[in-house]
C-alpha cells in the first residue's frame, strides 16, 4: 500500500481484513507528508502500525534525490517542531545550492510584482516557465498573482478555477446600493438590499416596478419609526451618490451597516463572518484608483473576460508557470518554487487552532518547500487591506 500516511480508518480496516490470516502487509509512506485530514486521513495509523503488527521490519528511505542540501535542511529544521512523527535524518547527494530566500514585501501587489520580475529574469537566463511554481495556502489567495500575470501577459496554468469575486452575491449587493444611489430604483434591485441591514420593509410595500421612497413613506405613514428608517435610507443614498467607488464600498459596509447584516447572516448560517469580510476586503481593494462607478463596472467586465480567456486557453494547452494550492502540488516538483503569503492566518491557516491542526499545517508547508529542486522563495507581506500582517511562526523555525 503506497502513500500510507493518507489512509483513513475505514480503509485501514479493509486492508487489515485483506491481510488476514498471514498479516502480510507491505506499506510505504512519509508521515511528514500527511496533509489530507479533511478527507479523513489519520497519520496516527502509520505511527501506530508497529503496535498493530509487532515484529514489523522497518526500512528508512532517508535519501532525498530532489532538493538541494540548503532546501532539504531548511525543511527538516521546520518539520522537526512536530511532536507526532517518526524521528528521521535525511540527506541528499545533490549540491549545497542557494540558501532559501525569505522575502519581506509591503503589500500583496508588491509581492506579486517581485515574483513576476524574478520569473522574467529566470526566463531571460534560459529557464522555462513550466519549471516554476507559485504556491498558496488557498485558491482565493492566488487572485492578486493571477491579476499581475494577466496584466503583464505572462502565461500561467492553474489546477483550480479561480472564482470571479465580482460574481459573488456580496458584490452584487454593493452594486445594487451604488446603482440605487445613481437613480436606478428598480423593484428587483431594491428587494435585494432593502433589508440588508434589516429595515423591516415588507415585500407587500414594494409593489411598483420602479420603487419610490415617497410611496413607501405613504405605505408606512402610520408607523413613524418606519418612516424614520426610510428617511435615513434616502439620506444615505444621497451621500453615496457623491462618493467614488472605494469610499462608497466603505460607507456601505460601515455607514449603512452592511457588515452588521453579514454578521447576522453568518450567525444564522453557522459560518464565519470573517470569510465574508475578507471577500469584501478584496472587492474594496479592487476599487482603489477608480473615479466612477462606470469605470469600476468596466474593470469588472474586463476582469471576467480575462478569466474566461484564461480558462479557454488552459483547456486547449497547458503551459506557463504553475499557480497552485499547496495541497494540489503534492507529488510534483519544480526547479523554482515561490510560496506566497507565508503569514499568520494563511500559513498556518487561521482555522488551525489545536496542536494537531498546527502540525498538519506544518506538514503542508513542508510539502510545499520540498517541491523545489534548486531555488526556493518564501514570501510574506507586512500589510494587507490596510491592516498589519504578521509573518508566519514557521519562518522562525526555517531559520533556526
PLM region spans:
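Proline-centered turn/helix-capping motifs that create local helix->coil transitions or kinks
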Residues: 23, 78-88, 245, 290-295
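ATPase/helicase motor core of nucleic-acid motors
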Residues: 95-98, 125-248, 267-271
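Conserved helicase NTPase motor core
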Residues: 1-47, 63-67, 331
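Conserved nucleotide-binding/hydrolysis micro-motifs of P-loop NTPases
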Residues: 31-35, 40-44, 64-69, 109, ...
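Accessory C-terminal helicase-associated subdomains
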Residues: 222-328, 349, 375
